[in-house]
Structure formats: structure tokens, C-alpha cells
Amino acid sequence: NLYQFGKMIFKMTGKSPIFSYGDYGCYCGWGGKGTPVDATDRCCFVHDCCYGRVNSCNPKRSTYSYSFQNGGIVCDDQNLCKRAVCECDRVAAICFGENVNTYDKKYKDYPTSQCTETEQ
């Protein structure tokens, strides 16, 4: 669920999940459109896509079993639906951790009007 996801984010980044990632770029937070603004925003884009694939599992509210081991996150729920949701959150939290050095405060509270499709 979102609380567990927040704990994963804090563990992997040392940042406040709500204040740092709750409204960042075009995809971190509720909804999303356009092109991700940077690597952190792309983590959110991928996470949104993952939640889309497991939508029938109620990902924002589904409570799953996981643990922190050797600096990593282990999803160990026996329920396949819950484990799938956990994996979405785990991959995103790791992604945030891998991109914490390029996190840019200018994308915090980024106006959605700037989130448009880019021409290829």
C-alpha cells in the first residue's frame, strides 16, 4: 500500500516520500501525462505503468509482506497479487535510490501544464 511504498522510498533514498516525491515532475503523484522530465520522474512513470498492470489487485490499498535485507527490499508475500504490487513498489524505490543524485528541486511541484507530449 502507499504507506509501505513510502517506507521503501525512505529506506532507499533517505528522503521524505510525500514531500520529495508526492508531486514531482509529470508522473510522481496522482495521475500523469506527457514525457517524464528526468530519471526520477521516469521511475514514477514506470511505477504508474506497473500499477496499471496490477490494477485488479488494488495496488494503492493492498497490504503486502516484505522486508529489508542486506540493504535491499525483499517481497515475500505468498499471495501472488500482493507480491506483484510489492514488486512494483520495490522496483520504484530502488529506482529512486539509484537516481537520488540527479533529483532536481526545480521539478518539485512542477506545473502539469508543462507536461506535454514531445514531438518525435
Swiss-Prot record:
One cellular component (GO) term of this entry: extracellular region
Names of required cofactors: Ca(2+)
Gene3D superfamilies to which the protein is assigned, alphabetical: Phospholipase A2 domain
The keyword Disulfide bond appears for this protein: yes
Cofactor binding mode and count: Binds 1 Ca(2+) ion.
PROSITE patterns per record: PA2_ASP (PS00119), PA2_HIS (PS00118)
Self-association state and partner proteins as the record states: Monomer.
UniProt-recorded name of the protein: Acidic phospholipase A2 Cc1-PLA2
Organism of this sequence: Cerastes cerastes (Horned desert viper)
